[in-house]
């Protein structure tokens, strides 16, 4: 006859085994939760719209193919409305209420990503930004949970300087907005210009919501630069192009990678013709040589997006595409839900995306280099490649 004590031990073990079985079953069926914060309204809406569409398409595709390591993927997306406060609130909600395993898509604007970063750091949740400002991932000892699918403004500014030097240009003016995006690039040009023999003859700033840049451009005209580099993602960049041509300015007009949006060029009309931009590979993907490893990824993504939405993707959607690839690959490599292992997997990534060859390390939380950037021109309603992306 079984004693009461032995019966109780057996009962406890039985309950534990049942609980363990339920936990194992629960773990087997548990979905990976990926959070995204994009601005699909507000000043950054033109950037965020196709980013959101892209990640929704990708999650649908991976779930139809069986998920990641047999786990389904759940995507949770919030609109930051181009507002820092809303971006931070959305990040807190993703982490504390939705309990996401990773964030891929951090605001789609540098200022928003910079505001979201401390939240991810505080909670120990991997965050992948699609924005450009260098401080998103540096210094590395204060960016352990922050990664990005984009170049930093260090490489983009460096690529602009390469093009200036190839054309014998030495006199440049910079007109940047006062956001984190504009300020970061301004600081970068200050660092790089002197050593490259570039004389920045005028520094001007403007509010991202500005609708008149004539005063700044009048001062720039007096300094007689060869090129005017504007740095913004806001519609005020259209005002820059229109005002410059209205003033009869003949200088080369140039935008950074925040303005690779055909809609913005169309809004500027004839004033945009000949504008030079520094960008990631995607907009000129069809013009890349077949030997470029990113070309096939670009064409495949473009075909998939057009098949689903009956419209063309853009470079911002491509950035979100590469960012979500990062998330998928890291989750697959981590083989579980341990956020530290997911973070470590991100540091080991090496893959080809739409915008180049990504190589990450514990010391480098963005995978692209200056050679992944291109210089292009808006000509006759399309992008024309001026300086290509070298294969690493």
State what each model feature region is.
Residues 2-14, 20, 24-392:
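Extracytosolic ligand-binding ectodomains
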């Amino acid at each position: 006859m079984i004693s009461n004590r032995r019966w109780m031990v057996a009962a406890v073990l039985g309950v534990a085994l049942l609980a363990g079985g339920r936990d194992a079953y629960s773990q087997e069926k548990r979905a990976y939760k990926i959070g995204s914060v994009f601005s699909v309204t507000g000043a950054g809406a033109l950037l965020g719209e196709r980013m959101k569409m892209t990640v929704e398409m990708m999650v649908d595709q991976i779930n139809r193919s069986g998920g990641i390591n047999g786990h389904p993927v759940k995507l949770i997306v919030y609109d930051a409305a181009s507002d820092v406060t809303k971006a931070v609130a959305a990040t807190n909600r993703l982490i504390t209420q939705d309990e996401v395993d990773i964030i891929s898509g951090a605001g789609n604007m540098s200022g928003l990503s910079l505001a979201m970063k401390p939240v991810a750091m505080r909670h120990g949740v991997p965050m992948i930004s699609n924005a450009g400002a260098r401080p998103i991932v540096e210094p590395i000892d204060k960016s352990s949970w922050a990664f990005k699918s984009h170049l930093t403004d260090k490489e983009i500014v460096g690529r602009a300087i390469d093009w200036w030097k190839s054309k014998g240009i030495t006199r440049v003016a910079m007109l940047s907005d006062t956001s984190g995006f504009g300020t970061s690039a301004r600081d970068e040009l200050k660092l790089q210009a002197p050593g490259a023999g570039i004389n920045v003859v005028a520094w001007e700033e403007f509010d991202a919501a500005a609708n008149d840049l004539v005063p700044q451009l009048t001062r720039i005209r007096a300094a007689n630069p060869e090129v005017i580099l504007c740095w913004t993602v806001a519609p005020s960049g259209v005002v820059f192009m229109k005002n410059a041509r209205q003033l009869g300015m003949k200088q080369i007009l140039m935008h950074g990678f925040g303005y690779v949006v055909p809609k913005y060029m169309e809004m500027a009309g004839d004033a945009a013709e000949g504008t030079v931009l520094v960008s990631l590979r995607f907009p000129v993907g069809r013009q890349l040589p077949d030997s470029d490893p990113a070309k096939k990824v670009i064409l495949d993504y473009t075909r998939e997006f057009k098949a689903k939405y009956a419209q063309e993707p853009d470079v911002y959607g491509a950035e979100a595409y590469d960012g979500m690839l990062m998330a998928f690959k890291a989750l697959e490599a981590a083989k579980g839900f341990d956020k530290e292992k997911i973070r470590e997997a991100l540091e080991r990534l090496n893959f080809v995306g739409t915008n180049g060859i990504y190589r990450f390390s514990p010391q480098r939380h963005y995978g692209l280099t200056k050679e992944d950037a291109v210089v292009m021109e808006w000509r006759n309603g399309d992008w024309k490649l001026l300086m290509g992306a070298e294969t690493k």
